[in-house]
Amino acid sequence: MGFFLFSQMPSFFLVSTLLLFLIISHSSHAQNSQQDYLDAHNTARADVGVEPLTWDNGVAAYAQNYVSQLAADCNLVHSHGQYGENLAQGSGDFMTAAKAVEMWVDEKQYYDHDSNTCAQGQVCGHYTQVVWRNSVRVGCARVKCNNGGYVVSCNYDPPGNVIGQSPY
């Protein structure tokens, strides 16, 4: 009986390892769903009293097409297309939907709503795009780059960050 259990250990280990891999792989994909992107955006928007975004498959297709072009070198270069756009990059499974949006929303600390400006030397345009009241549709995509990193793009319709206008 002891021999039988011992001889089954390698296959048990293999099955356990495969199961763990599937769980981790699934959770990684689950952290990048449409709902994950929407929840992260709409939490930030609710904090400033802005209506929630809705998911748009056409905008998401645009985002997917564009990040696919960035996969070769993972350089963040804006598309300058018809939509507002936020880009993020990171390594491994660290760069999830929620993490990308969190990075953009963290710029809130540099935004002064009263003067509608960013603190000197700081960036806050990603944050203002996330909460831009006139942007009502979003589509996002994530791609693994050839260097092993990830690029995330969220695109917004209509685009925000209109000069002279406040986001909310």
UniProtKB/Swiss-Prot annotation:
Signal peptide start and end residues: 1-30
Localization annotation: Vacuole
Cysteines joined through disulfide linkages: none
Main location: other
Gene Ontology CC: extracellular space; vacuole
Inducing factors: Synthesized during pathogen infection or other stress-related responses.
Keyword Signal: yes
CDD domains, per the entry: CAP_PR-1 (cd05381)
Origin: domain of life: Eukaryota
Post-translational changes noted in the entry: Three disulfide bonds are present.
Record-level GO BP terms: defense response; sexual reproduction
Family matches, as SUPFAM superfamilies: PR-1-like (SSF55797)
Keyword Oxidoreductase: no
Keyword annotations of the record: Disulfide bond, Pathogenesis-related protein, Plant defense, Signal, Vacuole
Domain SCP: 38-156
Recorded family membership: Belongs to the CRISP family.
Its biological purpose: Probably involved in the defense reaction of plants against pathogens.
Protein name as it appears in the record: Pathogenesis-related protein 1B
Organism name: Nicotiana tabacum (Common tobacco)
